[in-house]
Amino acid sequence: MSDSDGPFLTGRLLIAMPGIGDPRFERAVVLLCAHNAEHAMGLAVNRPVEGLSVGAVLKRLKVESTIELPEDLVLMGGPVERDRGFVLHTDDYECPASSVSVGHGISLTASSEVLEALAGHNSRPRRSLLALGYAGWGAGQLEREILENTWLTCEPDEGLVFGDDHPRKWSRALAKIGVSAAQISRFAGTA
């Protein structure tokens, strides 16, 4: 059974509701990279690590560059395994051994080959972001949080995922589903 055969949300954006109760996810926009009956995994796409650029990470890892290194900020993908790196990128780049399609023209790769591609060694993806850590949910946990109105969902687009206007991504994601932040209560619940 593939993720698309059920009520799974792989490839969609999660939008944190105000008052989520966890400062790690306050105003977060998370791209779900995997979601099935056993687990869910996603990367926050609007949490820059101030002062840490992709170029600086590549230098620290001693990845030699054939181009000017990108100054895009590294993102904090989530609270799990924060020392592990993940690259979200357009699907024009693929590393067959380690790239996973997320959908909507976006792939996820976590290998040294993609870092070399970012440094200009190989065919580079048209757009990309580097995130440290990920957000993870156990079986049924994300579904429960959605039922409790902790998260809204929307379709991703390249601007929301790869754009560098991180402070506005949350309000832009809400606008994409026809909601403004002023319309949302900080208190979740059901009637």
Give the residues covered by each predicted segment.
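A short aromatic-anchored loop/beta-hairpin motif
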Residues: M1-A131, A135-A191
